[in-house]
Amino acid sequence: MMGVNAAPAARSDPVSMAPQLYNKVSDDGWHLSIQIRGEVVNSVPNLAAAANSREAFVTATASATASGGSSPIQESLFILGYQLGCQSDVSAGLVVGGTAGIAGSVGLPSASVGGSVGAAGYVQTILQPGVIVDLPMTNMALNSAGRATLSVDNLHIKADACGGDVNIRSYAYFRISTEAAHTSYAIYGDPIKI
């Protein structure tokens, strides 16, 4: 008995991404720093083998610090996440339809017989412009020493119903609030196709 085995889907090697760092001084004198380091993106074949779905596993560490300000920090938020860009949104799905028919004829007096067969069909989808979504992975507030560290290790990212390329990029968002000012800023990793 002979069988046909499909070759396994190609698998990419994990990619180490460049570290990112951004320092800033707020209007009320806080020295702020955020960074992303140790980022690895492992793009893998889609588990369902769907042609319009992409998957990856991500690892990254982000840290934030705040020091030297004149007004105490009343509230803070630090987020590590990913942005995912889908080239074309095909979530409306496919519509398949058609018609078919058979027609016959008989001619007299020559006793001729004839017939015809016809079919028409279509496949239709609604292509919408690409979309970009935020995928916050984890968050926390600064501790009493003005520090926060966030880590994700081998977390799953997936995109379904995407026609064309799917790209992701990491981000770290940092916000502090004092009586004198509210400061928000972010850094972004390099985009990578998954």
Which role fits each region the language model picked out?
Residues 1-12:
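Secretory targeting and sorting signals
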Residues 13-194:
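Primarily mature extracellular domains of secreted and cell-surface proteins
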